[in-house]
Amino acid sequence: MIIVKNHKFKLDLLQNEANKEKFEGNTACSTAAYTLVREDASTGLTYTADISKVGNQISGEPAQRIKIREHRRIPKFDLPNLKVSKVYKLPLEASYAKGLLLLLIFCFGLSGCNTSKRLPYSHKYSYKELSKDDPHNLTYKGHYKVGKNYKIKGKTYKPHNPKSFTETGYASWYGGLKDGFHGKKTANGDRFNRNLLTAAHKTLPLPCLVKVTNKANNKAVILMVNDRGPFKKNRIIDVSQRAAEILAFKNQGITKVKIEYLPNETEKFLKNINLKKPQSKTLAKNSKKSSSNKVTNNNKCSVNCHIKLINLKYKLAVTP
């Protein structure tokens, strides 16, 4: 364990194809590589930096023999997956300790600059906890579709797959005990569950991801659009009961929101739930051949779990 001004680090052996030597006591080959892990409790983030050791002895050698090669950020809850062989104490000379700390702060500062809006996943939840509302929903039940033009109450709607899309208007929610929607099929063959992070929209592709922000309180959540609606005047989106609770407008029933379509996150999400898009626009208009018969890429993480992970990536709440 390296301690520099209250910052704690773990030393972890990395595999080296050319030289697969392991720790023995406090010695290691000069070609061995290690991982430096920094935990920042104030932000809940964890960083790693690959460092190389020049010399044989870890303990008792001047600290200058350790140098940083590269760094990256990792989800804190992935730390148990790191193969930690042993933990060591490294003596740090006062002058070098200060330099190492400044270098680490500089490296980690650069790492954070480009990702200030997209923070790594939270460490507070396990896959089991994130999947508690649909633990057996490991195979997506619906299919991908954009859909044909349709008419409701004399108004024609034209579903499409935009490159970018934002919309501001009023949101309502559905899935209450008396409205009868819970458990019914959605427009793309999925099964509606009032406890999941889903929504209905008139024209966006199904399924896709949107960020919904409550203009009244700035609370936001990312939802999977898997149904059509709402068709009441001035309503632009219907969200599930759980989403309404997170956005804090369940009691009043409606609120003004901003919708942002997330095409890049949608593409990643479709891959994670093993749902392929139809090859042609014609098939996308009304496709049931795009249904997934494979479990999600992480068989411990349900479909709703994958939606929650994206929320955590953007540091958004997944519970009311």
Curated annotation (Swiss-Prot):
One of its GO terms (biological process) is peptidoglycan metabolic process. Signal peptide: none annotated. One of its GO terms (molecular function) is lytic endotransglycosylase activity. Disulfide bonds: none annotated. Residues 12-59 are annotated as: REP05 insert 1. It comes from the Bacteria. Keywords: Cell wall biogenesis/degradation, Lyase. CDD domains: DPBB_RlpA-like. Residues 62-74 are annotated as: REP07 insert. Pfam families: DPBB_1. Coiled coil: none annotated. Residues 89-98 are annotated as: REP05 insert 2. Its EC number is 4.2.2.-. InterPro entries: RlpA, RlpA-like_DPBB, RlpA-like_sf, RPE1, RPE5, RplA. It is an enzyme of class 4 (lyase). Lytic transglycosylase with a strong preference for naked glycan strands that lack stem peptides. Belongs to the RlpA family. This is Endolytic peptidoglycan transglycosylase RlpA. The gene is rlpA.
